[in-house]
């Protein structure tokens, strides 16, 4: 278990490529929770990341997520839950919830797992995402007011319509 709390600076930073394969991460950072100057690969693990003044996950290069359970909560716009600048953001597995003022959009041509982006909600409200045929995709209590919600999971079916309630 990695329990990281900062009152200044990043939670975890790499000047090159960063790869996370497994582990439990609880990161509460003033600046970016996870920051990679190079490519960032998340292949597994359970990550709960919150930034009080910047992005929860930030890479200046491509971001690839193949597995894991990720909750990434960034601060207000223009900061976000997940920031891959304008680089490739590839999702092929895992469960990802990105909350914040903004989010990078997954690169559709690179992804093999579906994602959805919703407008935000207020703090301490429970959001419920479900398909038009009432199949639950997610229920989660949002700890802070956010403008953007990104969700990706194997539960999201191609061609289905999803709505968020709170």
PLM region spans:
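A composition-driven surface/loop motif
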Residues: 1-166
């Amino acid at each position: 278990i990695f329990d990281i709390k900062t009152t200044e600076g990043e939670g975890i930073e790499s000047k090159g490529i960063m790869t996370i394969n497994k582990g439990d991460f609880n990161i509460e950072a003033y600046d970016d929770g996870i920051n990679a100057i190079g490519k960032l690969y998340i292949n597994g693990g359970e990550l709960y990341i919150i930034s009080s003044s910047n992005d929860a996950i930030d890479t200046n290069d491509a971001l690839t997520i193949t597995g894991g359970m990720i909750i990434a909560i960034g601060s207000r716009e223009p900061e976000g839950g997940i920031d891959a600048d304008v680089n490739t953001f590839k999702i092929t597995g895992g469960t990802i919830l990105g909350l914040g003022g903004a989010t990078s959009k997954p690169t559709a041509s690179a992804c093999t797992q579906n994602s959805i982006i919703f407008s935000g909600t207020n703090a301490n409200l429970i959001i419920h995402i479900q398909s038009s045929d009432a199949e639950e995709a997610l229920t989660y209590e949002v700890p802070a007011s956010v403008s953007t919600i990104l969700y990706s999971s194997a539960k999201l079916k191609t061609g289905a319509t999803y709505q968020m309630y709170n």
